[in-house]
């Protein structure tokens, strides 16, 4: 008998994976956490039935959420990750010796525990002494911070459930205050393909534009995320993601990334016409 896991991405679209084994299933204080071993994508973790990370394509997401801002400002020293419980974002940041410290705020301890147990190559830097891990609400954590971080990465779930507050204007305003003069904020920004996700991308972008002087959107192809086409937001107090790209400095680091490179960086900000229209006009 074959075992398949099916994720409902919209009311009319589903993505299915042939499963070798269901390795873990438990309800945390916040959400249902499952780990499945699949034939094509290796082990994957789901939160409330939605794919959060897979062994096969996680490098795409983590490369793009970390190396894009780091190539714009390779002098980043202090970083805040909100979410990121699988540890992939922390892993990529720890490749930079210039980074002094990372605060990582994950609301659900179970996500980190499961990542340590089942995804050791992704969670490998969670014990790094340069990483401080806080199991609390990122919305509350950021409230009293001022001029502290050079980079804030919002590596959150979708704007429902535990991640909902991470998409509010008040939260983005607090992030702005917490950033230094050349501070950068990066967030995952949903997909422009399906209407329900496109609306959230537009909302997040419009809120950021009310607060930050520089706001841009960039893209990546992530097979297991809804539609396979995903957007990220880049917001900064003073640095433009393309005009201020430090290609030569970043390339000298020889990080040997699997997805990201500085040519791709420039192209990632060249959006299809329909996506540009969605963002500029605020209509799906």
UniProtKB/Swiss-Prot annotation:
It catalyses: S-adenosyl 3-(methylsulfanyl)propylamine + putrescine = S-methyl-5'-thioadenosine + spermidine + H(+). One of its GO terms (biological process) is spermidine biosynthetic process. CDD domains: AdoMet_MTases. One of its GO terms (molecular function) is spermidine synthase activity. Pathway: Amine and polyamine biosynthesis; spermidine biosynthesis; spermidine from putrescine: step 1/1. Its EC number is 2.5.1.16. Pfam families: Spermine_synt_N (PF17284), Spermine_synth (PF01564). S-methyl-5'-thioadenosine binds at residues 31, 106, 137-138, 162. It is found in: Cytoplasm. Spermidine binds at residues 62, 86, 155-158. It comes from the Bacteria. Homodimer or homotetramer. This is Polyamine aminopropyltransferase. It comes from Alkaliphilus metalliredigens (strain QYMF).
């Amino acid at each position: 008998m074959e075992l398949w896991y099916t994720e409902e991405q919209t009311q009319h679209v589903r993505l299915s994976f042939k499963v070798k084994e269901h390795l873990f299933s438990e309800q945390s204080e916040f959400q249902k956490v499952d780990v499945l071993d699949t034939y094509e994508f290796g082990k994957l973790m789901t939160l409330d039935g939605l794919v959060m990370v897979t062994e096969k394509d996680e490098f795409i997401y983590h490369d793009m959420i970390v190396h894009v801002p780091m190539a714009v400002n390779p002098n980043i020293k202090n970083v805040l990750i909100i979410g990121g419980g699988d540890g992939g974002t922390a892993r990529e940041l720890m490749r930079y010796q210039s980074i002094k410290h990372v605060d990582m705020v994950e609301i659900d301890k179970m996500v980190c525990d499961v990542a340590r147990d089942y995804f050791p190559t992704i969670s490998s830097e969670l014990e790094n002494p340069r990483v401080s891990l806080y199991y609390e609400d990122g919305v509350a954590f950021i409230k009293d911070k001022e001029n502290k971080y050079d980079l804030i990465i919002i590596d959150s779930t979708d704007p429902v459930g535990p991640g909902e507050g991470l998409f509010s204007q008040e939260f983005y305003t607090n992030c702005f205050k917490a950033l230094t003069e050349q501070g950068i904020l990066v967030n995952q920004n949903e997909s422009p393909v399906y209407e329900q996700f496109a609306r959230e991308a537009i909302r997040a972008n419009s809120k950021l534009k009310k607060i930050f002087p520089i706001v841009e959107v960039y893209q990546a192809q992530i097979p297991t995320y809804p539609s396979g086409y995903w957007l990220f937001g880049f917001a900064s107090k003073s640095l433009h993601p393309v005009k201020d790209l430090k290609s030569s400095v970043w390339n000298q680091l020889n990080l040997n990334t699997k997805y990201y490179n500085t040519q791709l960086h420039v192209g990632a900000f060249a959006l299809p016409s329909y996506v540009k229209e969605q963002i500029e006009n605020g209509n799906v």
